[in-house]
């Protein structure tokens, strides 16, 4: 039981004061009477007994704590003691102090999914006792109530909820899994007068075989997407070639019709080609001598064509 330093100092000062009075009475050179000696000794005993009684009759409840009292006569009292200093009957009553602040606890469990995959899952719970039910908690569970209850109910709820989902659903539907675990845990803990402020899944791992299978599936999906992209690209290139071929065919058809209607188009193309050949030869460092036939500039043919045209 906690005592304030001021109380002990007051008791010590009173004891020293009474002791100094006895010493002063004996130091005057007079022989004290037996009655006076017994009176002084009785006063010391009374003062010491009073200090001991007060020391055992008071106890403190710190912040964030609550207390109940066990009586040797009546058993566990239903009264809840709040923070502060309180009085009890020494040697008959015993204070039992509970920490009512929320405390975190991590519980790990190895369980199986609906598709028979093993998963390691860790659940973090933030729990505290129901203050109103502290006498019942002490009667049924004691002061280590969280050690007795939380590991078993958390494991049971985790196994029951995880068994409802496939391994892949634990990842894609994690919010739903967490909600079901929270609802079931809050309901189970309330039967033991334990309040849960927060429940969350902090860790989840699968077997190496399942992890490798998931990675292989992801790689296969990426390869399939890459192949689909290549096929789509080839299809687009093929369509482009068809369009170009159709354009070239249409162009050839138009050129043929133009030639049929007039030979001036052929002469224009011949002159353009001759000009291109001349530019290439002029820019070449080698000396080349060509006649009109090679340059497509046959003047005789040109004159003959001109004569026919006339």
Curated annotation (Swiss-Prot):
Subcellular localization, as worded in the UniProt entry: Mitochondrion inner membrane
Membrane topology annotation: Single-pass type II membrane protein
One GO BP: mitophagy
UniProt motif (AIM) ranges: 138-141
Record's comment on post-translational modification: The N-terminus is blocked.
Chain coiled-coil ranges: 212-253
Keyword Methyltransferase (UniProt): no
Annotated GO CC locations: mitochondrial inner membrane; mitochondrial prohibitin complex; mitochondrion
Main localisation: mitochondrion
Regions crossing the membrane: 38-58
Location of region: Interaction with ATG8: 130-144
Pfam family membership, one: Band_7
InterPro entries reported for this sequence: Band_7, Band_7/SPFH_dom_sf, Prohibitin
Phenotype when the gene is knocked out: Impairs mitophagy.
Entry annotated with the keyword Transmembrane helix: yes
Keywords of this entry: Coiled coil, Membrane, Mitochondrion, Mitochondrion inner membrane, Signal-anchor, Transmembrane, Transmembrane helix
Note: Present with 2850 molecules/cell in log phase SD medium. Mitochondrial targeting of PHB2 is ensured by a bipartite non-cleavable presequence at the N-terminus.
Subunit structure: The mitochondrial prohibitin complex consists of two subunits (PHB1 and PHB2). The subunits assemble into a membrane-associated ring-shaped supercomplex of approximately 1 mDa. The mitochondrial prohibitin complex interacts with the m-AAA protease, a heterohexamer composed of YTA12/RCA1 and YTA10/AFG3. The mitochondrial prohibitin complex interacts with ATG8 and the interaction may support mitophagosome assembly.
Membership in a protein family: Belongs to the prohibitin family.
Protein name: Prohibitin-2
Originating species: Saccharomyces cerevisiae (strain ATCC 204508 / S288c)
Gene: PHB2
């Amino acid at each position: 039981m906690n005592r304030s330093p001021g109380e002990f100092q007051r008791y010590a000062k009173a004891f020293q004061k009474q002791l100094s009075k006895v010493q002063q009475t004996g130091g005057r050179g007079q022989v004290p009477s037996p009655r006076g000696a017994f009176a002084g000794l009785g006063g010391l005993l009374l003062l010491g007994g009073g200090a001991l009684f007060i020391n055992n009759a008071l106890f403190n409840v710190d912040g964030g704590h609550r207390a109940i009292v066990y009586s040797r006569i009546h058993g566990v009292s239903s009264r809840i003691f709040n923070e502060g200093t309180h009085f009890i009957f020494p040697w008959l009553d015993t204070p039992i102090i509970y920490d009512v602040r929320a405390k975190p606890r991590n519980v790990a469990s190895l369980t199986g999914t609906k598709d028979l995959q093993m998963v390691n899952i860790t659940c973090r719970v933030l729990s505290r006792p129901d203050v109103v039910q502290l006498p019942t908690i002490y009667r049924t569970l004691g002061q280590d109530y969280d050690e007795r209850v939380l590991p078993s109910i958390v494991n049971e709820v985790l196994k029951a909820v995880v068994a409802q989902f496939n391994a892949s659903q634990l990842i894609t539907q994690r919010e739903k899994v967490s909600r079901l675990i929270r609802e079931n845990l809050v309901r189970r803990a309330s039967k033991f007068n334990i309040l849960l402020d927060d429940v969350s899944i902090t860790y989840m791992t699968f077997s190496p075989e399942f992890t490798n299978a998931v990675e292989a599936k992801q790689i296969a999906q990426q390869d399939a997407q890459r192949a689909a992209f290549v096929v789509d690209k080839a299809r687009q290139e093929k369509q482009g070639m068809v369009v170009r071929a159709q354009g070239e065919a249409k162009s050839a058809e138009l050129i043929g019709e133009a030639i049929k209607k007039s030979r001036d188009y052929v002469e224009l193309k011949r002159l353009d080609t001759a000009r291109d050949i001349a530019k290439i030869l002029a820019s070449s460092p080698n000396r080349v001598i060509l006649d009109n036939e090679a340059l497509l500039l046959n003047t005789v043919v040109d004159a003959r064509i001109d004569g026919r045209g006339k």
